[in-house]
Amino acid sequence: MPGTTDKAPGDDTGLLLPVPDEDGAPFWDHAARGELRVQSCSDCDELRFPPRPCCPHCQSFASHWRRMSGRGRIWSYVLPHPPLLPAYAALPGYNAIVVELAEAPRIRLVGNLVAAPDAPLNSVDPARLRIGAPVKAVFTVLPGGVTVPRWILERP
């Protein structure tokens, strides 16, 4: 899956942005269209994430991208104290969550819980974070044109 960088063209925030690699690029292409998709084996139909060339279940190299509902639940979370990078110092109380997808419980994505798609990373009171809380994906276009999935509480 993609690594991260501290700067992208047109970005002056210093926040970490995805750097798509060959296997993960379709994930980000679909995100740019507002779709949450996960790589699926074309032979055994097993989902896999992070994306990779070979199916870990049947070793097939044939794959496609299956659309997900965008719903899930918080499987885990962390509140970094203090913020680990300088650009995040202005965002005290931001979170990083791990979401277990509703239709694929073995697939877990890392992201941020926000109050609205374009809200800052620290827009949700940390006291509202709960393991098992239902969430749904929203998509945010960041400076530099990169679109990332973030998460909002399904029942705020």
Model-derived features with residue positions:
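Conserved hydrophobic positions within beta-strands
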Residues: 72-74, 113
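Well-ordered alpha/beta subsegment
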Residues: 9, 106, 110-156
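Short functional micro-motifs and their immediate structural scaffolds
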Residues: 49, 62-64
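Short, conserved beta-turn/loop elements at beta-strand boundaries and strand-helix junctions
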Residues: 77-83, 104, 140-142
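OB-fold (S1/OB) nucleic-acid-binding surfaces
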Residues: 89-109
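Short, cysteine/histidine-rich loop/knuckle motifs that typically chelate Zn2+
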Residues: 40-43, 54-60
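A broadly conserved sequence feature marking short terminus-proximal activation segments
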Residues: 1-36, 143
